[in-house]
Amino acid sequence: MVVVLGIAVSAFAADAPVKKGKLRHVVAFKFKETATPEQIKAIEKAFGELKSKIPVVVSIEWGTNVSPEHRDKGFTHCFIVTFKNEKDRDTYLVHPEHKKFVDMALPSIGDVFVLDFLADN
């Protein structure tokens, strides 16, 4: 079944039109209960500094959850990293500064949610 699904997805992807537009890399964090406010602040600061350390990053926006809907599943922080294209995102993912950030942040993070999309505008 997995093979059939993989073939179906591959066939669909091959027929899909190539989208153009800025790529948005959305990352949401749920911190461990043991994460201190100081550790969380250090992670916020370090994530924001990636723009000045990785040239392919167009912008980084972030904030904490303020939704009244109570559907956050414990995720408190959201970061949106903008790239010109998928190639730049791929460069970012393997960049030494990104890897250093991940190594620093991971011990305090209980869960992470990542979603990328190509913006229509």
Describe the role of every protein-language-model region.
Residues 78-120:
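Surface-exposed, polar helix/loop patches in the mature regions of secreted/periplasmic/lumenal proteins
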Residues 9-76, 84-91, 117-121:
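Short S/T/G/P-rich N-terminal loop/turn motif that feeds into the first structured element of a domain
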Residues 1-8:
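Bacterial N-terminal signal peptides
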Residues 3, 18, 53, 100-101:
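Generic hydrophobic-segment detector
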